[in-house]
Amino acid sequence: VYYYKKVPNANAKGSLLALLASGILVAAVLYGMVPGIVKVGGWFELFFVNTLGMSFNSGVMVYIIVLAASIIWGVYESYTEKNKMRMSVSFVLTIALLGIPFYGHGTSAVIIGIIVIAFLFFYLSPKMQASMKEKYRVSARTLNTSLLCTMMIVIGYSSYAIIVIRSTANTPMDQNSPEDIFTLGEYLGREQYGTRPLFYGQAYSSKVALEVKDGYCIPVEANSTTKYIRKEKTSPDEKDSYVEVPGRVEYQYAQNMLFPRMYSSAHIPQYKGWVDIKGYDVPYDECGNAIMVNIPTQWENIKFFFRYQLNFMYWRYFMWNFAGRQNDIQGSGEIEHGNWITGIPFIDNWLVGDQSLLPQELKDNKGHNVFYCLPLLLGLIGLFWQAYCGQKGVQQFWVVFFLFFMTGIAIVLYLNQTPSQPRERDYAYAGSFYAFAIWVGMGVAGIIKLLRDYAKMQELPAAILVSALCLLVPIQMAGQTWDDHDRSGRYVARDFGQNYLMSLQESGNPIIFTNGDNDTFPLWYNQETEGFRTDARTCNLSYLQTDWYIDQMKRPAYDSPSLPITWDRVEYVEGTNEYIQIRPEIKKTIDALYAQADSSGNPEALQNIHNEFGEDPYELKNILKYWIRSDKEGLHVIPTDSIVIKIDKEAIRRSGMKIPEALGDSIPDHMNILLRDDNGNPKRALYKSELMMLEMLANANWERPMYMAITVGRENQLGMDKHFVQEGLASRFTPFETKKLGATIDSEKMYDNLMNKFKFGGIDKPGIYIDENVMRMCYTHRRVFAQLIEQLMKEGQKDKALAALDYAEKMIPAYNVPYDWQNGAVQMAEAYYQLGQTEKADKIMDALANKAIEYMTWYLSLDDSQFFVSTREFEYHIALLNEELKLMEKYKSKLSENYSGKLDELYGMYVSRVKGTR
């Protein structure tokens, strides 16, 4: 924009040079100034703290003062022009303090910085400037403008200081705890997300390059970094200091390619789902052992870029906004979810199948929006009108085009996304859609020009006519998208978050472990903003692996005391106790030592063994004290895969937890935790978050209730799932083997929670918008009702079961939350059958069976290529219908006769269709 304003008769060469200069300036800010300020500020901090012995953040304060003084000095000198040498020195000093020359890491960054600073000083020196031609000289105005620009950028970025200030205040929510210049740098650099190759790098099957060193085969490091963390003090008198620890290590790969798009070894099946990968074999030297490695070809790599990253993850979103959207269900490439449509039948039928035969739940989806490509056509007209509107129009076109490109396709290139993203990413490209919307607006002017040129209309009548007609386009868009953007009357996030907290015991300052965003942030919101259940503590297991989060858990928050963690910070600081090996094979040796000491009759020998390993080496508190937290390196393991926890029976009785009826009043003396993964295989190590859970189990003594959100996966449950008792949206830790005792649900508490305490965010209101994420939580709530009802039926509490069924139907109605196999609808129908409520049961089963038939009918209407990729979904629905039919027949429902014939008919059509496509 600046170039075109200054040079009215700009040419292509000048435009490209201006674009290049713009890119250099952006790179200088993003990769020079932003990390450079952190880098130079870090050097000041290290010097003042480690060398001069001053307190934390003193060096940063000095740096800020020096940087501000340097900028002011430079602006003053370049404005007054009294002394050219001082002007050059002040400018170079400012650039150096901003860290722009120090690109890279470690020693190389310093060397590069010194070279750049020396060159810059030499170039700007008065003698050199005087000897140059006029066009190569740098004027004082240029230096002054540059310094003013950097000053404004620094002032803007100074807002990040609030992050450090807030973190230093130790607020209850303090992500990453960036309390100094080094942790702030990690925070700004998003280092927890890792890196990905962009222009050159590995493929998903590439192997790390190896070399033989000192007789060992080791991976070759491409580059490594170090970082500084605060040293933990061993005494209050010790001075503040930082210690250097290893940072991120990147390894060199033996097989690399240009523009690598398929690079993640964790997404190989997904890559192969998008591209038919044959690959080619390349030799790989495995320290003398030659093997062949199959990597994708460059063309296969490019095909994935176009098919997935560009088409599916950009143009699909683009068409959502300017052509139409199939529905708001997240798609992974399947034909029925998340695609773009137009509203024009013959186009849509060719793209995504016969839309008139769509299952009713897809037809009724509020995210089903059709624009008939009218915004797209207007945008294309505006694009061409601007591009062919004289020299000024061409210049404006390139400005809008680069805005469109840099906020759209350039982001696609930079993100290098893997398949199976956790959510739709259309928000990342909003700037690009805004840019195209400029062309949409210009399309009105383009149509006016067409009418004037070809219909010979006067300007005013043409403008009135076109404006009136084109106004219908945004009206159509608003009419289509209003219902799926209207959140009025919906309080799901607040209420469902409260339901998690309401599932917890009202006394005892309970703890609830969560893991994902949707079962954590609503709870934090309720505690932070609504002041709801501030006596409880929400603990996110994915953060519990970090030292900064453990710090927060050890502090009181709101009305909740600290969590029962007794470890000193030096024991869990980053790099310490990240994991502890499980070594059950040493159990025999330990048992032999105990037996030998016991049989020796020597009390001193037995006492020595107890002093070394504890009285019971496999009991949790002993393991924590004598093994995990031991100073002796050889004992820094877990010596068993079955941890024993002694049970304080009186504490259990005081705790308020339900004692299984099968036990009567008897409580076991101990419980065992089997250290297994979610597949039942023995674990080989426990990570820091799991160690913290064990620490809390050991110290809470059952008197402080501990819960696991039901949405946390088994892999994060520490093998405690056999001991859980569900009380709502959370399961309570107990010392009882509840699965064996048939006591996995406390029906009394759960009934009270669901029927009297839970709120449902307005999802019972007809017509309320429920998007996919909210629908998942609605499914969870219906499943919880189904679990409660099943337990009540087992206990013979039929009146309560019927009341819960009817209440679930009222609060989670099918007109907003359709019946589905995944949300407990089948279990509810069976309960209705068992209670003699055949009509209500038939209503649910009829909806489920009809839904399966609608999907299968639609799949059968697809063309061969579309049907081929949908066969798995067809088989899924036919299996569901078969199970539904069995349930109908079991309870002698009249529906079974009708659906039995339809099942046979559809299966026959499927068999003939499959044979025909082979």
Where are these regions (language model features)?
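ER/secretory pathway lumenal C-terminal domains and tails of membrane proteins involved
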Residues: V1-Y429, F436-N509, F521-R918
